[in-house]
Amino acid sequence: MKKLAKNILQKARVIALVSEKNRTTQADELTAIRAINNKIKLFLFFISGNFSAMKLHKFIAVFFVSFLFAQSSQPNSKTIQFLIEDQQIQKIYSSETIKSIFKNPQQKDVEKILLKFKNKPEKTRTLQEYSKIFITDKRINRALVFYVSNKNLFREVYVQTKVDPFLVLSIISMETNFGEAQGEFRLIDSFFTQIEYIPERKEWAEKQLKQFLIYCFNEKIAPESVKGSYAGAFGYGQFIPTSFESLFIDFNLDGKKDPYGWEDTIGSISNYLFQNQYPVDNNNFSINSEIWKSVRTYNRSDNYASTAIYLRNEILKEFYLLD
């Protein structure tokens, strides 16, 4: 196993160094060589212990990406090439601006994003394990406080959409813990990673990145400044860019769709479910019900939808006890 890892790493080193030699000064090349050698030493240190084949495979994947990382961050990367050739993007961003936005992808974050895609908790854990993350006394109590503080808003949203307010509470809790955990990654790094390194997500990520850049241009926001989830969702409700464009609404009618405002966020989560076959005048919150199926469109995971329903039920139960 160690011999295999060393052979892979030696090949990666050659490829990476050839890339560096083709595009850097001598000083930059020496810096790159030192960085690559340091990563190899760290990698070999890790595999010197009792690593399983699965863990070794993950380390090889991440370190191989780090060796080739410099190639994708250059103007000929798939991400930059796609944007430069897109007619809509051409009208609002120059080639130089696009290259500038992507000139410094965060390498450590790219590696973290790849690992997170491989270890999605809603996909890799059982329902019992996954639900324990979210169904806690602390989250339930926080949901009750949040609901009481925004009771009139929830009632107004319910009148318009007929979407259960406690289900919306549950989703807000799971997505960002009421705005506390909005994600640590720059969205440009999320989409860059998916386009460059995850072929099955490339086309999807290109659409999201394009819409995200259009949003940033219209709102006069620096794309590098927006952070969100590893998958590319942002704001209190964690909308992806295309869903933000089509389903996020200006609920308070102030002329702006605000992903960091609770009025628009609560209204938009309800609107999202309503537009995705949420059944009106239906109180069936069982697993595989029509309501469950609507929630599943928010995050296409059975565990997610089931946990959202369970958490909603627990919040409602405690609310009745308070009343």
Where are these regions (language model features)?
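Short, mixed-charge aromatic SLiMs
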Residues: A32-I33, N37-I40, D264, N299
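Functionally critical loop-and-helix segments that line ligand-binding/catalytic clefts
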Residues: Q238
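Ser/Thr-rich, low-complexity intrinsically disordered segments
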Residues: K3-V14, T25-N38
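Short hydrophobic targeting helices and cationic amphipathic motifs
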Residues: L9, L44-F46, F51-S52
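Cell-wall glycan-active module
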Residues: N50-F59, V65-E206, Q211-K227, G232, ...
